[in-house]
């Protein structure tokens, strides 16, 4: 006899706790723990180009120095407008390392919408996809870092993008854009940097970590600030809710 969905749900009652532990560290601690426990495990897979947790942490620490040398300090806001790419991951955790606030922007949002969001959070440094850089003018921001999202692809794919054929040009134009004078290459800056000093203070769990922007379905998108503890609790909720996860052995597909 087929059991009802309610009867099946009863089997799960003991699997998910009624209370979830509240984290006592910053979000950077999550990455640092993963790099310490699983240094050689693959953290990112981007079109077949893989990066281990240890390599990602090294990139994050280099990027943290780049931001700090650009004038970003604890409590400052950094605008990030990137699609899913390794640089987006690194930029976010670089902010988390130095206690900056990562303001996540839709890279396809119109310039008028971005102007309002920049005005609300007051960030003076932006890390943006080349295709949307025009929405982040230097007369509003002190520093604009541009990101080539093809940079993290395997060398063979980047070589194909440079072929003088129509299909390669079309794909290249979808991925890359014209970079205005006065901007800086995020990829070159982070590659030539050195890791930030280990003595640089970590943020506290109650410091602001992220500003997320709502969809604006009912009007102008709102800016929602969240602390390290807010996001950390959400991470713990996901870990306990998806209760059959095996630590260090799962793969997540991001769209």
Model segments located where?
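Flexible, non-catalytic linker and terminal segments flanking ANL/adenylate-forming cores
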Residues: 1-24
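Conserved AMP-binding/adenylate-forming core of the ANL superfamily
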Residues: 22-23, 32, 42-85, 89-93, ...
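Surface-exposed loop/turn positions
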Residues: 42, 76, 100, 206-207, ...
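Conserved adenylate-forming
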Residues: 67-72, 193-206, 211-254
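Conserved short alpha-helical elements in the N-terminal third of ANL/AMP-binding
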Residues: 94-98, 250-251
